Amino acid sequence: MMAGGGSGRCLFTATQWQELEHQALIYKYMAAGAPVPPDLLLHLRHRAAAAAAADVDTVPSLAFPPHHLGWGCYGAAAAQYGRRVEDPEPGRCRRTDGKKWRCSREAYGESKYCEKHMHRGKNRSRKPVEMPPPAAAAVYRPSALSISPPPHDADAPSYGAGAGAPLQLHLDSFHASTSPPPSYHRYAHTSSAPLFPSSAAGYGGGWSLSKEHCLTLGGAAADLSLDKPADHHHDATSATTEKPLRRFFDEWPRSDDGRTPWDGTQLSISIPTAAAASPDLAIAGAASRYHSNGDHLRTSE
């Protein structure tokens, strides 16, 4: 290139002109998007090494440090404009507060966060409610106890004021659980009144006492019969045997072989009367019983 004004002097030397042509050729490859041939780059490296050995003042291009090829110099700018930056600690939870703090726990599985921060961004109202297992939901319910009097019968013996009628108990269980809780029988579950009257406390729960004759103070001895209900293991159609109780062994009936039948249980019953409260009444009652027994013996003879 020649300078204007008729001076005839060149602005660039031959070496500089050759270098400009070489750089223009590299620029054409870069503008076309084609890869730059290695021999052109190798020539630049040799020229840079030779210039480093020479004086810095003679080579103005060496006054500025050369830039490395690639995207290294644009890393900070790329991070600011949305380009993904590699995580320096891949296995660490990425939950941060937007500043300097970062979670120190390890990431769970393939997730980027730990177990604590995995569901932090989701709506917690949609989390399924944990239901208790069916075994734990079973609650003990007490058995329903109903008491009903026996059906009235015209032929049934009447009970006095001192003896109460037997009660029938119906027990319906819900079977909600196998066993009640240990604190169930402690409070407010005991019966306030006894189920059976006090007059029948001396006898078993399955025995019923019936009177055939009225008892009078100082009167004749009453014949008592002890009825035992049929066992639930036996047939319901079998009738219960009724045996009268006698005051003396001589009054017991004899069997065919002349022996007294002792196949049953011997039971002696003493009936308290109102005469036991006063000594005079007790003496009068004993005298009246003595006379009545004598009359009974004479009648039997």
UniProtKB/Swiss-Prot annotation:
Location of the motif Bipartite nuclear localization signal: 83-102, 120-127
Provide a GO biological process annotation. Answer: DNA-templated transcription
Q: Does the keyword Transcription apply?
A: yes
- Annotated WRC domain ranges read 87-131
Q: Which UniProt keywords are given for this protein, alphabetically ordered?
A: Activator, Nucleus, Transcription, Transcription regulation
A single GO cellular-component term on record: nucleus
| Family matches, as InterPro entries | Gln-Leu-Gln_QLQ (IPR014978), GRF (IPR031137), WRC_dom (IPR014977)
Annotated QLQ domain ranges read 11-46
Subcellular location(s) of the protein: Nucleus
One Pfam family it belongs to: QLQ
One GO MF annotation is:
ATP binding
Family per record: Belongs to the GRF family.
The record's function comment reads: Transcription activator that plays a regulatory role in gibberellin-induced stem elongation.
- Notes concerning its domains: The QLQ domain and WRC domain may be involved in protein-protein interaction and DNA-binding, respectively.
Protein name (Swiss-Prot/TrEMBL): Growth-regulating factor 2
For this protein's source organism, the top of the classification is: Eukaryota, Viridiplantae, Streptophyta, Embryophyta, Tracheophyta
Instruction: Point out the gene that encodes the protein.
Output: GRF2
